[in-house]
Amino acid sequence: MADKSHVNNVPMQGNGAYSSHAALQHEAMLKALPLFRAAAEAISKVDSTRVAIVEYGSAHGNNSLEPMEAILKSIHARSLELLFSDRPENDFCTLSKTVTEWADGLVENQLLHPLFISMIPRSFYQQVIPPKSAHLGFSLAALHHLDHVPQPTEDGQDESKLLQRQAHVDLATFLKLRSKEIVSGGSLILSFVGQASAGYENYGGPVDACRNAMIQMVQQDKIPVSVAQAFRVPTYNRTLSDVKKLMDEFTQIWKVHDLFEDDVMHPAFYELKIQSNPSQEASHKYAEIVIDWMMAVCSGYFTKALQVGSQGGYTKEEEESLLQDWVTRTKELFIRDHKDEEVICSFIYIRLERL
């Protein structure tokens, strides 16, 4: 069992903050909709009175609904079960509000299907639902998050190699678990952040600004070096080649219908570029948006680093103050060093059929 400080148990920023700052994830989801339509067409041919659709890693649910609607449009006169799952630490109150309001709207619009909704507080690196109980599963913008940070080995292996191996193990574990849960002929749709074949660094400007803001805080004795050393976001960006090699291990279980990568731009960049010469106000607004987007994912890991690196030496008020300091510095450094730069990310997309 991994040491608790290495376990990935940090949720996305709660109280609706993540859902309010997930525009890039929404853009990535839109590119996956054709895969959902293809999978829905296959489901429509299944001879079953009940169809179950499960999402692995729902967060607050704001990017779950359009894929669900794409599926529902192709399914007629059946009992539908929609299951939303995420780690126990997730903000299920926000998820419940998002999903309930959406479902109530469907019912008011005379949805033809009996609709049953469940939420499951369980990591997708564990079995989430009973065997052979789902017809379609999907996970969007989540699988680059690892189960835990691999600990250093005695022979001093390179950290990037350890992360690559952990990413391989985690994706293999995920596919094995889903193969138990999804019926033969069912579908699994995945999208996650990948390493761009074009060679660019994903959201390089915000990452650089975050890093330099933390260095600045250490240099000014705002935080000790131990906090900076404890800061880890347990992710790994797989290459398309990594994923293809892994899928070769599952040819008896999963059939690959689609496997490709695509670039996803933060939509705020398009809004900025509508202006031929963006004003200072527009540039500051852009910085606010893209850094708030990154912090919706990273802020919890900064707070965890404060707790681990100081061995619980900060009060909650001090943690909140230091977090706000880091966020403010990051925005200032983004404007100074990366003003108006595009924020782009490579995503890998997969559509699988359970054999």
Curated annotation (Swiss-Prot):
This is Methyltransferase FUS9. It is an enzyme of class 2 (transferase). InterPro entries: MeTrfase_7 (IPR005299), MeTrfase_capping (IPR042086), SAM-dependent_MTases_sf (IPR029063). S-adenosyl-L-homocysteine binds at Y18, N63, D86, S123, F124. Mg(2+) binds at F231. Its cofactor is Mg(2+). Coiled coil: none annotated. One of its GO terms (molecular function) is methyltransferase activity. It comes from Gibberella moniliformis (strain M3125 / FGSC 7600) (Maize ear and stalk rot fungus). Keywords: Magnesium, Metal-binding, Methyltransferase, S-adenosyl-L-methionine, Transferase. It comes from the Eukaryota.
